[in-house]
Swiss-Prot record:
Keywords, alphabetical: Electron transport, Heme, Iron, Membrane, Metal-binding, Mitochondrion, Mitochondrion inner membrane, Respiratory chain, Transmembrane, Transmembrane helix, Transport, Ubiquinone
GO-annotated molecular function: metal ion binding; ubiquinol-cytochrome-c reductase activity
Annotated heme b b566 binding sites: H97, H196
Function: Component of the ubiquinol-cytochrome c reductase complex (complex III or cytochrome b-c1 complex) that is part of the mitochondrial respiratory chain. The b-c1 complex mediates electron transfer from ubiquinol to cytochrome c. Contributes to the generation of a proton gradient across the mitochondrial membrane that is then used for ATP synthesis.
Family statement drawn from the similarity comment of this UniProt entry: Belongs to the cytochrome b family.
Protein name: Cytochrome b
Length: 379
């Protein structure tokens, strides 16, 4: 008789994906972030569901309903802070996951990589709309500024913005539709993540050496199920420590003031995980140019498979590319810092230099480094 997990139609799918899946024997802790992102998504959907039970998407009562959740709902404060900081954890894991993909050449699995980029866009859209829902000062003005960027699109821009707003300013219609989209998008993300996994399992995982691992595979369970579980425990412990001791560290104090269309905050800025893109947007004086740069700052990831010139897949044995990779990481940290600073000297020029360096490393320096390394390493 066949084992149930190998014969039952549903369990067979789970078996092929998480139990009998052949996996490379040498994948490191950097391969844990896929499962951690799955954990983040589950945490966000669960906490978000409970928040949605008590939240009201109306401009008059939205801010009060969030205060009510924190004060009157049993453990509402905990659910709210888990959800708010869960978004930060989600993006930390996302950026580390993408960084791993760039460093070890995982982008050579083109379908998996491109669906990953779609997932990134979906997650960014979800996070942006979620930030609007508490209807604080930064929620309102962040929504106004970011949606207004679409007005830079020639000919249809103004009509498009009013269509998204559902009126002539960010108001009740905007809040209601943002709540609806914020609720549905995580389920679309979950479905897209399944497709992401489907394509990954067509090729199998990459590994730190960037070489085929068909000669040395091990079953996913128990080796990587336990390894992933350890990662989940460590990250959860750090996350809960953060939520319980420093819940407001990453938030903006302005969001504790109710939205007021008549009073603009001195510095409008998004959440920390969007600051690098916001800095690139602000570094170009032209509105349309800034919007194009903003979109390209993420879309440029799709060019990685096309710009791969090295004969080795991974950066593990390519010192010039390694140097450029860590310069890129440092550059992104500088952009994140600049995005949170006011638009005044010397921050303007630092942001412009960092933006140019960001695109230069990806589009020019890394491909050139690959060619140089081919020569040096006699490939």
């Amino acid at each position: 008789m066949t084992i149930l997990r190998k014969s039952h139609p549903l369990m067979k799918m789970v078996n092929h994906a998480f139990i009998d899946l052949p996996a490379p024997s040498n994948i490191s802790g950097w391969w844990n972030f896929g499962s951690l992102l799955g954990m983040c998504l589950i945490i966000q959907i669960a906490s978000g569901l409970f928040l949605a039970m008590h939240y009201t998407s109306d401009t008059i009562s939205a801010f009060s309903s969030v205060a009510h959740i924190c004060r009157d709902v049993n453990y509402g404060w905990l659910i709210r802070y888990i959800h708010a900081n869960g978004a930060s954890l989600f993006f930390i894991c996302l950026y580390l996951h993408i960084g791993r993909g760039i460093y070890y050449g995982s982008y050579m699995y083109k379908e998996t990589w491109n669906i990953g980029i779609v997932l990134l866009f979906l997650t960014m859209a979800t996070a942006f709309m979620g930030y609007v829902l508490p209807w604080g000062q930064m929620s309102f003005w962040g929504a106004t500024v970011i949606t207004n960027l679409l007005s830079a699109i020639p000919y249809v821009g103004s009509s498009l913005v009013e269509w998204i707003w559902g009126g002539f300013s960010v108001d009740k219609a905007t809040l209601t539709r943002f709540f609806a989209f914020h609720f549905i998008l995580p389920f679309i993300i979950a479905a897209t993540a399944m497709v992401h996994l489907l394509f990954l399992h067509e090729t199998g995982s990459n590994n730190p050496l960037g070489i085929p691992s068909n000669t040395d595979k091990i079953p996913f369970h128990p080796y990587y199920t336990f390894k992933d579980f350890l990662g989940v425990i460590i990250i959860l412990a750090l996350f809960l420590t953060f939520v319980l001791f420093f819940p407001d560290l990453l938030g903006d104090p302005d969001n504790y003031s109710p939205a007021n269309p008549l009073n603009t905050p001195p510095h409008i800025k998004p959440e920390w995980y969007f600051l690098f893109a916001y800095a690139i947007l602000r570094s170009i004086p032209n509105k349309l140019g800034g919007v194009i740069a903003l979109v390209l700052s993420i879309l440029v990831l799709a060019l990685f498979p096309l710009l791969h010139t090295a004969n080795q897949r991974s950066m593990m044995f390519r010192p010039i590319s390694q140097f450029l990779f860590w310069t890129l990481v440092s550059d992104l940290l500088v952009l994140t810092w600049i995005g949170g600073q006011p638009v005044e000297p010397p921050f303007i020029i630092i942001g412009q230099v960092a933006s140019i360096l960001y695109f230069s490393i990806i589009l020019v320096l890394l491909p050139v480094a690959g060619l140089i390394e081919n020569k040096i390493l006699k490939w």
